[in-house]
């Protein structure tokens, strides 16, 4: 008789995680990024992998130690093998999970979100800062050298829609759509629409046709084809959503909301209901691996 044993990743600092399993969460805040298996528990014991900037600080210029003090985006990319990280204290990087190697870095003032585009490009949304308030485009092979820049007040969200070949960008009060030029070295603004409410905060992809948009006092579903917003009923009475992820097929909702100021110690989920409490980190965003 053969017995099959399935072992879920449960790592210590000395072990490697080559790829984040589907259904796991990535959370970030302060100078740290965590990978969480929500099926383990609802406290810090659910953390199966963690990274602090100082672990990789010697790989890039020393000044970056000042720029990764408040991480505010931790997006899984490259088939969940890497994490795209931004920090409001002034930088963006691409981190390989297995060896914690920084593969791209750039000074991005008050960066709040980033995403990958075809052609090894990365787009970054920068929020309110004398050198920020912008959308920037970089090549992964050329750290610190933006190849395109557009003004964007209080940039907070960036999402690439691969089916439509469009980049969606969230600012303070508008949602923009860009196309990548044929030469893949610039972006063209296609259209702009006002969002319901002010203080655009998070932008995430539901599917090829819909986006989730959070602002200070509301969360809405944006229909790309119809170009209209509808209230997101599950969070209709919840304010100050900092990050929101919704799987429409399973109805699984995972989000963070400001509770202590702009941060929280909790990650919330529904279907089933769950609250993961991590008291040692000022959590800002959570992302889900699909």
Question: Can you describe what each PLM-predicted range is?
Answer:
Residues 19-21, 78-80, 117-119, 162-164, ...:
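Residue-level detector of Asp-centered blade-edge/turn motifs that repeat once per structural unit
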Residues 51-82, 87-90, 98-113:
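Blade-loop segments of beta-propeller domains
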Residues 1-18:
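Bacterial Sec-dependent N-terminal signal peptides
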Residues 47-51, 55-65, 100-106, 144-150, ...:
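A short beta-strand motif characteristic of beta-propeller blades
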Residues 37-43, 179-185, 223-230:
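Short loop/turn segments immediately following beta-strands, especially the blade-tip
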Residues 85-88, 127-133:
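Short, solvent-exposed loop/turn segments at conserved positions within beta-propeller repeat blades
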Residues 61-75, 107-117, 152-160, 196-206, ...:
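Repeated scaffold domains used in trafficking and secretory/extracellular systems
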């Amino acid at each position: 008789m053969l017995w099959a044993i399935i072992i879920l990743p449960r790592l210590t600092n000395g072990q490697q995680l080559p790829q984040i399993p589907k259904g796991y969460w990535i959370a970030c805040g302060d100078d740290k990024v965590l990978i969480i298996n929500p099926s383990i528990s609802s406290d810090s014991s659910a953390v199966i992998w963690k990274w602090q900037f100082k672990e990789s600080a010697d790989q890039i210029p020393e000044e970056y130690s000042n720029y990764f003090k408040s991480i505010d985006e931790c997006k899984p990319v490259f088939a969940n093998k890497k994490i795209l990280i931004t920090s409001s204290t002034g930088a963006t990087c691409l981190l390989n999970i297995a060896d914690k190697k920084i593969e791209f870095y750039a000074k991005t003032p008050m960066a709040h979100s980033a995403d990958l585009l075809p052609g090894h490009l990365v787009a970054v949304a920068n929020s309110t800062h004398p050198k920020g308030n912008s959308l920037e485009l970089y090549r992964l092979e050329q750290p610190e050298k933006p190849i395109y820049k557009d003004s964007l007040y209080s940039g907070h969200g960036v999402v690439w829609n691969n089916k439509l070949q469009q980049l969606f960008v969230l600012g303070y009060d508008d949602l923009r759509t860009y196309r990548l030029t044929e030469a893949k070295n610039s972006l063209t603004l296609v259209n702009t629409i006002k969002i319901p409410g002010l203080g655009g905060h998070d932008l995430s992809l539901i599917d090829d046709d819909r986006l989730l948009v959070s602002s200070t006092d509301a969360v809405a579903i944006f229909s790309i084809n119809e170009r209209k917003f509808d209230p997101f009923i599950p969070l209709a009475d919840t304010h100050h959503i900092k990050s929101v992820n919704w799987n429409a097929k399973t109805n699984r909702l995972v989000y963070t909301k400001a509770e202590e100021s702009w941060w929280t110690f909790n990650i919330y989920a529904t279907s089933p209901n769950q609250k993961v409490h991590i008291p040692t980190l000022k959590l800002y965003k959570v992302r889900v691996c699909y």
